[in-house]
Amino acid sequence: MSLLNCENSCGSSQSESDCCVAMASSCSAVTKDDSVGGTASTGNLSSSFMEEIQGYDVEFDPPLESKYECPICLMALREAVQTPCGHRFCKACIIKSIRDAGHKCPVDNEILLENQLFPDNFAKREILSLMVKCPNEGCLHKMELRHLEDHQAHCEFALMDCPQCQRPFQKFHINIHILKDCPRRQVSCDNCAASMAFEDKEIHDQNCPLANVICEYCNTILIREQMPNHYDLDCPTAPIPCTFSTFGCHEKMQRNHLARHLQENTQSHMRMLAQAVHSLSVIPDSGYISEVRNFQETIHQLEGRLVRQDHQIRELTAKMETQSMYVSELKRTIRTLEDKVAEIEAQQCNGIYIWKIGNFGMHLKCQEEEKPVVIHSPGFYTGKPGYKLCMRLHLQLPTAQRCANYISLFVHTMQGEYDSHLPWPFQGTIRLTILDQSEAPVRQNHEEIMDAKPELLAFQRPTIPRNPKGFGYVTFMHLEALRQRTFIKDDTLLVRCEVSTRFDMGSLRREGFQPRSTDAGV
């Protein structure tokens, strides 16, 4: 740890009985691939799962001998077990039979309990060594039963669902299907380059705004989005109404015949226009006149109300501006009072100040993420009158040279109320302590003592609110040591600063501390 003047930075087969056949029909089938792995047998499955599956439903070559056939499910024995009466069953089948049909053997009705069953490992090894055919259609491979599962995992004839249309296809065909045959494969429009599923392309082509279409009237080829404008304005053969349709002419003609129609029907169009004008100039009856007067009165009333509301709005706006200025003045007064209260509180410290740093876990996380963490304490006085000081805590980054993962702790002088009445530069002793917050009778605080060096700028009278130059320890305490005891409690770190403007070496020795040698100021 170094003390530095810091500037800003720092069995046998038997025929099945009627009872056995009935049990076979009642045993539930499971449509799930049987686990037959090469080195990992079905014995690795959980007991609850094993009780729900039957024998191996595969084709054996040569055909399965009857001695390896379960009398209940009539398939090859899976997890073969033997009864005291010498019969073999699938483990799951016989357990289900005992629980559903009673404690008896399905073949000879002898009394049979679950704890009387014992594994037939010989039969199990024999069955797993039998040759079987791959169940996938088209695959001609044969292998031992124990290798069937591994083969099926890589068999090119195994079925798998297309990720786009969800239909099943054999593995060797799935890529061709996805690229060329799948109705949900992605294609793009030749006209607008939009992407869509192949099965949706036909509908898109019928509505694509950039597709070429032929005008049904003049056979002009245009893109679809231009066609409505073409019909309304440009198509020479599109049917349109007469210009005088609003006045009573109901004729329709091609656009290129409109001029001839207007020329040939000028007189009739004029008569229609005259009748329309005449109907508009007819004097309305008294009922309409009274209604118009009522509307005028209503408008006049609304205008008066609008003027009054406008005046009210202006008055309210002026009041609001006055209130806003008053609130701003109150806020300034509150800030001034808060500053005065803080100043008074700082003066009550009498040189001993305990700084509570909350949310310290957040600061440690920022340090681990290599984000700079620099925290300043509120100001405090060494007495009344006295010097005004503050502390600065800096969590050094993991990449910092010579001080990585250390807590740096410094003291800064501040402009205070009594600066003009105090001797400068500051002289005295500063004791910095990180408090142990454990409940132990004897607490092990981490404490360092330093003497002020009057020749350093850090102890000169500050010319700005806070002296940018500080004095303290770059390597005050390692973060690993911080975690070894209860220095952090309720996510809060307590830092104590005791300042004495008189240096009493005798009192320091009596308390068991020796002043540390200080490094040259930087």
Swiss-Prot record:
Keyword Transport: no
Molecular function GO labels: histone deacetylase binding; identical protein binding; protein kinase B binding; protein-macromolecule adaptor activity; signaling adaptor activity; tumor necrosis factor receptor binding; ubiquitin conjugating enzyme binding; ubiquitin protein ligase activity
InterPro entries per record: MATH/TRAF_dom, TNF_rcpt-assoc_TRAF_met, TRAF-like, TRAF1-6_MATH_dom, TRAF6_MATH, TRAF6_RING-HC, TRAF6_Z2, Znf_RING
TRAF-type ZnF: 150-202, 203-259
Glycyl lysine isopeptide (Lys-Gly) (interchain with G-Cter in SUMO) cross-link, chain position(s): K124, K142, K453
Region of interest (Interaction with TANK), ranges: 355-522
Reactions it catalyzes: S-ubiquitinyl-[E2 ubiquitin-conjugating enzyme]-L-cysteine + [acceptor protein]-L-lysine = [E2 ubiquitin-conjugating enzyme]-L-cysteine + N(6)-ubiquitinyl-[acceptor protein]-L-lysine
Zn-finger region bounds: RING-type: 70-109
Listed SUPFAM superfamilies: RING/U-box (SSF57850), TRAF domain-like (SSF49599)
Assembly notes: Homotrimer. Homooligomer. N-terminal region is dimeric while C-terminal region is trimeric; maybe providing a mode of oligomerization. Upon IL1B treatment, forms a complex with PELI1, IRAK1, IRAK4 and MYD88; this complex recruits MAP3K7/TAK1, TAB1 and TAB2 to mediate NF-kappa-B activation. Direct binding of SMAD6 to PELI1 prevents the complex formation and hence negatively regulates IL1R-TLR signaling and eventually NF-kappa-B-mediated gene expression. Binds to TNFRSF5/CD40 and TNFRSF11A/RANK.
Record-stated family: Belongs to the TNF receptor-associated factor family. A subfamily.
Name of the protein described by the UniProt record: TNF receptor-associated factor 6
Lineage, opening ranks: Eukaryota, Metazoa, Chordata, Craniata, Vertebrata
